[in-house]
């Protein structure tokens, strides 16, 4: 019986960035930190310039002839690239409409579960459709459903704004919430405290 193939469980080798001594090309086209073209110089001279400026020599275009390097603060450059990637990912998030369903006769525990669900959706950047479902003659109590949705909007006001106030939709009562873009100042006391703090700082 042939031996069973072995699976390599080792973690994949992490590719290291081409900077400083890892750059092996003898001739390089070098761009200074301020964008000035230093022209084509040998590797040793390029490294010496980077060291004099207490910066890094970073390979930015390996396919060019000769390869192009830039003198920069690599740590800062990497941080900015990661920051831009995170922002791009955040902007690419497709807003969805998540639904939270309940009956107008809801106990406190179940209500808190719905509040937690809505909070999670809002923090993820999604809109929330709050739906109160009526059964049979319960449709006569739309006022209670409106009160429940108003209570929900109040409890979520720090995370959400009401995009659409409660209204009938078939045999349901619905309300739409959207993530709050600006922080909520609850009352005059907070406004006064905030103003005093600003005057103290200035």
Curated annotation (Swiss-Prot):
PROSITE patterns: IF3. Pfam families: IF3_C, IF3_N. Disulfide bonds: none annotated. Keywords: Cytoplasm, Initiation factor, Protein biosynthesis. The keyword Membrane does not apply. GO terms for molecular function: ribosome binding; translation initiation factor activity. It comes from the Bacteria. GO terms for biological process: ribosome disassembly. InterPro entries: T_IF-3_C_sf (IPR036788), T_IF-3_N_sf (IPR036787), Translation_initiation_fac3_CS (IPR019813), Translation_initiation_fac_3 (IPR001288), Translation_initiation_fac_3_C (IPR019815), Translation_initiation_fac_3_N (IPR019814). It is found in: Cytoplasm. Coiled coil: none annotated. GO terms for cellular component: cytosol; membrane. NCBIfam families: infC. IF-3 binds to the 30S ribosomal subunit and shifts the equilibrium between 70S ribosomes and their 50S and 30S subunits in favor of the free subunits, thus enhancing the availability of 30S subunits on which protein synthesis initiation begins. Monomer. Belongs to the IF-3 family. This is Translation initiation factor IF-3.
């Amino acid at each position: 019986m042939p031996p069973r193939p072995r699976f390599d469980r080792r973690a994949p080798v992490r590719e290291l960035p081409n900077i400083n001594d890892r750059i092996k090309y003898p001739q390089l086209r070098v761009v200074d930190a301020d964008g000035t073209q230093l022209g084509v110089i040998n590797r040793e001279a390029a490294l010496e310039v980077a060291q004099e400026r207490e910066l890094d020599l970073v390979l930015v275009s390996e396919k060019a002839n000769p390869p192009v390097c830039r003198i920069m603060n690599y740590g800062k450059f990497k941080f900015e690239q990661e920051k831009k990637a995170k922002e791009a990912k955040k902007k690419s998030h497709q807003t969805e409409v998540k639904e939270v369903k309940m009956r107008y006769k809801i106990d406190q525990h179940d209500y808190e579960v719905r509040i937690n669900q809505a909070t999670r959706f809002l923090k993820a950047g999604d809109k929330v459709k709050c739906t109160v479902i009526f059964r049979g003659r319960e449709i006569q109590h739309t006022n209670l459903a409106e009160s429940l949705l108003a209570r929900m909007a109040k409890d979520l006001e720090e995370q959400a704004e009401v995009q659409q106030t409660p209204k009938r939709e078939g045999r349901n009562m619905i309300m739409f919430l959207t993530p709050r873009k600006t922080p909520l100042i609850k009352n005059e006391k907070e406004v006064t405290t905030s103003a005093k703090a600003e005057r103290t700082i200035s």
